[in-house]
């Protein structure tokens, strides 16, 4: 979505994504689960050989101490013959915003600029709590270069920040989650045998309805 318009029903790239997803599922390469417990269990119980997710999933993975040295961090596969496709993406994370009701916007801006957008020391201190920054200067910190024993001594935090500099920027818009949910429903139906074109048209109609169009 961009500028509150939908691009679902005739989105050829999205169709390739869903087609690839279906092929992975049908071949057995992709394991589907029904809930979060099954998802984390598939990692902790050695049921899967890899996981495509944001860096925040590392905390869950490292609770399985018996798997230390068996996991690694790398980039992701990309679609071929798709303009702009890369081996880098993101999912989740947090955002900082200043409310329109803020009593001192200038002070709030200065605070954010001096801390989360200006202090590598802050990120060094909170790294041990599992808070990983994708703020580029943080990647130059000595703390981010420390080897991680669970991941075979790899400096995974430094690697993640480097990856983050290569993630394409997108404009999600205020109806991003509505679009995501509609496409998720469509994808589930398609993997179960529903017609791709009809499901994507239905998803687009759903989002347009939510946007009042």
Residue spans for each PLM region:
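C-terminal lobe and pocket-closing loops
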Residues: 57-68, 80-182
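Non-transmembrane alpha-helical segments in soluble domains
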Residues: 18-25, 40, 44, 99, ...
